[in-house]
Design a protein with these regions (language model features):
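Active-site-proximal N-terminal segment of extracellular/periplasmic enzymes that hydrolyze or transfer
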Residues: 23-80, 91
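Bacterial N-terminal signal peptides that target proteins for export
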Residues: 1-8
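A long, amphipathic alpha-helix that forms part
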Residues: 236-250, 257-259, 266-307, 317, ...
Length: 527
């Protein structure tokens, strides 16, 4: 019974937080001994990034019109607004945040999704995709993947995060409730006692993050913010906690050159109630007001800091009927031996499925399984929107469900897109909804599809097929979570891929309206 209780408690924390506590008492002591100045006092306006999970343009505009988002309305009217910024792919938070922090797609930062299979380790990697899935595998491994492996191992060490790049230039930064946070400062994460009591988990885990680090109940900057770390407030993984931690840095005049603050609440509400809900945006705006109020007035806030408010991904509405909305590809692949989630992968297994809501990786772990045969079987499902694989020459081949056409491409060539990327293309371009005019590529309903899909197809080792489903549908596999009648993301479609961006306090903007280009722009802002 004790082991079961430990598992339940651990999962409740893991799935809500994906992190552990830093030694905040020591940190605060060090900060009081070594007082810092804000970036503005050092002659440069600090940059504050507010990342609102699943923030979308249309519901944001509606919330503003109804008077439910006055803070975002103020920043928008004081600055610039871009309703369609392209996210990363898969449109899952860990991959998107890795793109935001590194300025690269998944082929360079190596975080393929929330769920994926490591051919090297011969096991599934889950960062907390849902209780049903996590309960079927080694829970302590899930815990370790989320709190340590994601940032310290799986995020490519050869690709600098913005925290690392700023530290290398003598600049300071802060991460507040962000999932991806790797930096140059070592922190000792204190594992909760009920987990540390297990002989498999150490009491402390060493990680690296930015100078100023806050992560829900386990890494608290503001000693007075404990009320927001209670179990009924998701142990600190909430907008109010994030806002008060950021306001604390402002009030203490310790705001560094860059602060990245994550507001998670809107995502959960959009998943449950659908992408048109406004409640999550209203709550996020209230949290933003807390941060702005720390300056005394909102006008002073804009004068003294550069503000960047953006979403990470959109969401597509999922149909209300479970049978109609869910796409289970296991029956299509039924004559293969599909690995079970609750068992180690064996030499007898042939296929592994890693579902990320509206996309999935299908791995052929048996060398006798031909990927092209897997694709042919998948084509029998007409709800599949994109089916992609690499051929023997590293070309990416794309088809669809119930469609015999083929599109193939690879980087480099005579065709150039709006982002200055060049490609070699052949076959049916309508499969990825691009049009060509004088060797110029124009994207349609799949923004920056060539680079984003290329990123996922080269994000990690192994032989695999990438699939996505059409809007309204969600992929399911063994025990994966569903969002019937709510919202889901993960795909390349514009509904999942386009997010709004508010900029206030500077007249500049990223060189392109893509999350992948925000890092370089921020680096210029804090030079």
């Amino acid at each position: 019974m004790k082991n079961k209780v430990t598992v339940v408690l651990m999962l409740s924390l893991l799935l809500l937080i994906l992190g552990c506590r830093a030694d905040s008492s020591q940190k605060l002591k060090q900060q009081s001994v070594n007082p810092h100045h804000t970036a503005n006092q050092m002659g440069k306006k600090p940059v504050i990034v507010i990342l609102i999970d699943s923030l979308m343009d249309k519901p944001l505009q509606e919330a503003i019109q109804e008077g439910r988002a006055p803070a975002m309305r103020f920043l928008l009217h004081q600055g610039q607004y871009f309703p369609q910024v392209v996210s990363s792919f898969p449109t899952m938070s860990v991959t998107i945040d890795s793109t935001l922090l590194t300025g690269t797609y998944a082929d360079q930062h190596h975080v393929p999704g929330l769920v994926w299979y490591s051919d090297q380790k011969k096991r599934m990697i889950l960062y907390g995709n849902g209780a049903k899935e996590a309960l079927k595998i080694d829970q302590l491994q899930v815990f370790n993947d989320a709190i340590y492996q994601l940032n310290q191992v799986q995020l490519n060490k050869k690709t600098k995060t913005i925290h690392e790049a700023l530290a290398d230039k003598g600049k300071e930064s802060a991460s507040i409730n962000a999932i991806v946070f790797r930096g140059r400062t070592e922190h000792s994460l204190k594992v909760p006692r009920f987990i540390a009591n297990s002989n498999r988990v150490p009491e402390q885990v060493k990680i690296t993050g930015p100078k100023w680090f806050s992560y829900a109940t386990f890494a608290q900057l503001d000693p007075g913010n404990s009320w927001n770390t209670s179990p009924w407030k998701k142990f600190g993984m909430n907008d109010e906690f994030s806002a008060k931690e950021t306001a604390f840095l402002i009030n203490q005049k310790k705001l560094p050159n860059l602060t990245i603050t994550y507001f998670p609440g809107n995502d959960n509400l959009a998943h449950r109630k659908g992408p048109t809900q406004l409640e999550g945006i209203e709550k996020a705006d209230q949290a933003l007001q807390t941060v702005l109020n720390a300056y005394g007035s909102w006008e002073e806030a804009v004068q003294n800091a550069t503000w960047i408010v953006l979403g990470d991904s959109g969401q597509s509405a999922v149909y209300n009927d479970r049978q109609a909305a869910t796409v289970d590809i296991r029956p299509l692949l039924g004559h293969y031996r599909i690995a079970k989630l609750n068992q180690p992968v064996t030499n007898d297994d042939q296929i592994v499925i890693a579902a990320n809501e509206r996309m999935a990786y299908i791995y052929a772990i048996d060398n006798n399984v031909d990927l092209s045969d897997v694709v042919k079987l998948l084509q029998h499902e007409n709800k599949l929107d994109i089916i992609a694989m690499k051929d023997g020459k590293n070309n990416i081949q794309v088809t669809k469900g119930r469609n015999g056409s083929l599109f193939s491409y690879h980087p480099g060539g005579k065709f150039t897109d709006e982002y200055g990327q060049s490609w070699t293309l052949s076959g049916e371009t309508n499969l990825v909804d691009i049009t060509l005019n004088n060797n110029r590529i124009k994207y349609g309903k799949y923004p920056d599809v060539l680079a984003r899909l290329h990123g996922a197809m080269n994000s990690h080792e192994g032989r695999y097929v990438v699939i996505t489903v059409q809007p309204g549908y969600e992929l399911v596999s063994e025990s994966s979570p569903t969002h019937i009648g709510g919202g889901a993301h993960g795909s390349l479609h514009e509904q999942d891929s386009l997010v709004p961006l508010i900029i206030s306090g500077t007249n500049t903007r990223p060189k392109t309206l893509r999350i992948v280009d925000i890092k370089d722009w921020i680096m210029q802002l804090v030079k």
